[in-house]
Amino acid sequence: MSIIEKSIEVNVPEYKAYAQWMKFEEFPQFMEGVKEVTRLDGKRFHWKAEIAGRNTEWETEVTAQAADQRLAWTSRGSVIKGCVVTFHPLSSAKSKIMLQVEYDSQGSAEHGGETLEAVSQRVQGDLERFKALIEKRWRPPGRDTIFDNFPM
């Protein structure tokens, strides 16, 4: 097993980043290769993805949750064995997201999957796409110009 640790700062409060991350069904919008995530019940989700050119499916189960702070889940049927994501306030409008991914690199090699470095790069890319999504979606109000040529 290997642990991949990545982090990113986002220009939204931690509670907004957490609220967006809790929308598992929207993961395909920022997670490379993920095609669909379906809620099975309050804690379990079914995933469909294309990874390393192969279609794959697996289930995850949420194992820990602390509102606006932390979310953890384990996986069955995937080389990603578990994830922990934490949300840390940096200011009233900025936060840091830290993601730990437990990756079975030996299991991946046996199935012709991705290298540890490739998965690490994909995880960083996922965080960067999440940042773009959340910052676009939660833009602070009051800074837009309503009229371009308004006389002062």
Where are these regions (language model features)?
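Hydrophobic ligand-binding cavity/cleft-lining segments
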Residues: 1-44, 129, 133-135, 149-152
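Short acidic, glycine-rich loop/turn motifs
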Residues: 49-53, 75-77
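Beta-strand/loop substructures that line and gate deep hydrophobic ligand-binding cavities in soluble
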Residues: 64, 72-132, 136, 141-145, ...
